[in-house]
Amino acid sequence: MSIFSLYTRVLELLGKEARLGWLLAFANLLLAASQFAEPVLFGRIVDVLSGKSVAGSSSAWPFLAAWVAFGLFTIACSALVALQADRLSHRQRQAVLTDYFEHILQLPLTFHSGTHSGRLMKVMLNGTDALWRLWLGFFREHFAAILSVVVLLPLSLYLNWRLAILLFVLCIVFTALTTFVVRRTFGMQMAVEEHYSELSARASDALGNVALVQSFVRVESEVQGLRSVANQLLEAQMPVLSWWALVTVITRASTTITVLAIFTLGIALHDQGLTSVGEIVMFVSFATLLIQKLEQVVSFINNVFMEAPRLREFFNVLDAVPAVHDRPDAIDAGRLSGLVEFNDVTFSYDGKRPAVEDLSFTALPGQTVALVGPTGAGKSTAIALLHRAFDPQSGFIRIDGMDVRGVTLTSLRRNIGVVFQEALLFNRSIAENLRVGKPDATEAEMRKAAERAQALEFIERSGGFETNAGERGRMLSGGERQRLSIARALLKDPPILILDEATSALDAVTEVKVNAALDEVMRGRTTFVIAHRLATIRNATRILVFENGRVTESGTFDELVAKGGHFAELARAQFMVQEQSRANTRASVTAAETIATAAKSP
């Protein structure tokens, strides 16, 4: 994407503010014309004062009055443009930031798993700030500066083409110098932004794992790593700053050289009667004005160039396409009963190896279907397809007889509740976390859901529903977080429930409490359970055994054990361990009883 096309897109993002942008552009055109008038009037006044008649008038007062009028107009118009440009840029920055935030929340989990959240935050804030600066600078002064140059050069030719040549030479030098520096530093600035991204990601990574950093005494190491990246950033930034500092120095030198050149040529032309003192003064003012405007144009180009890497990153994220979206004819499904059908469903992440292949099964309303198999067998993919994290490449999934692709994502996901392996909580109050399931839930409804999820006791003990859960729920224990997520699912009251290893990370005592809560939330719902611990799915209506993306066995727990297949091997392995543990416990108890009996004997 070239600098021009990049900036065109920046202006396209004005959206609803584009009409105000056009009005500001017109106001800038008027400002450019009025700024050109001032040096002309100044020159005419000098000519009159030096005894030369101008336009048939020997009085300077009419020119002075016109100058005052143009000055007042310029002041008023500049103030209005600055005020409206400020408001436009601030309003649109907030609008774009909100749109970006909504966009990244809709991107697939595969995108988020491969992109650091700290980088996404950095891209969002840096990108919207870059847009704000460019909009503000463009409408406040840069567009007026560009128009001033466009207006001034041809009119200076009309007034005195000999002196105007010097102004054209000045523009050519500026253009050549700016083009050279932009090309020279383009790659350098890209490297600078890469270092900024690395710096942001590294800092975010360390701050997100403070407990790990402190427990493994990694503070100094992490600081040293960040310092190393910061030093690399400075090394990459310094050459860019040096080149643009050179532009500034040459710009200032050009002011002096151009003014001296105009005076030198002007005196020579005056001696030959080819110009007046007023015209010399006029062109000195032109040169000063032109250099001022060229500096603003160079500043504009520099700003676009410096912001380009940030904007490219921003647009790259903005251009990322959500994996799924609503069809134009998608309908609101309303409240579903929970009949789920998979028919010959095949899906591949990379287009080569299928994650699930020819998957077919039916879950009736109220049934519990367990998905069992090794990691990577396709269990989580099947569930992801159910709530349309992705769409299958072939086959279809129906709920209550409706293809899930034919209903809106909002209505589909409103009918599905998920209890994750790791309870996901916001750094907000317990009440706000519960209301994720039902935004308009009353306190009475939250209390009832918490009680059913066996969470009310610890909520009241910790200070009530307004207690903050901490970042990612760290103010609560693992079991408390999980019971909150179950209460959240109860509040949502979906007809379809997904339990993704909901108790695998809990201790035995906590697991008993959570399982009791899960029994409550599963009642009367179509439930899909992803499980490795087979004891948790003993009472499932149906168990699907996954291997390499296919269902290789299907049936109840007892039926699958009786078949003697892969599931039976898993069951024997897990329950043999449990039986051995119980046997060891019984042996320990027996030994203790024997010792106690012997001690009592005379």
Swiss-Prot record:
Protein's recorded name: Beta-(1-->2)glucan export ATP-binding/permease protein NdvA
CDD domains attached to this UniProt entry: ABC_6TM_NdvA_beta-glucan_exporter_like
Annotated function: Involved in beta-(1-->2)glucan export. Transmembrane domains (TMD) form a pore in the inner membrane and the ATP-binding domain (NBD) is responsible for energy generation.
Enzyme class, broadest EC rank: translocase
Notes concerning its domains: In NdvA the ATP-binding domain (NBD) and the transmembrane domain (TMD) are fused.
Gene this protein is translated from: ndvA
Pfam families per record: ABC_membrane, ABC_tran
Organism, scientific name: Bradyrhizobium diazoefficiens (strain JCM 10833 / BCRC 13528 / IAM 13628 / NBRC 14792 / USDA 110)
Source domain of life: Bacteria
Family note: Belongs to the ABC transporter superfamily. Beta-(1-->2)glucan exporter (TC 3.A.1.108.1) family.
Molecular-function annotations in GO: ABC-type beta-glucan transporter activity; ATP binding; ATP hydrolysis activity; ATPase-coupled lipid transmembrane transporter activity
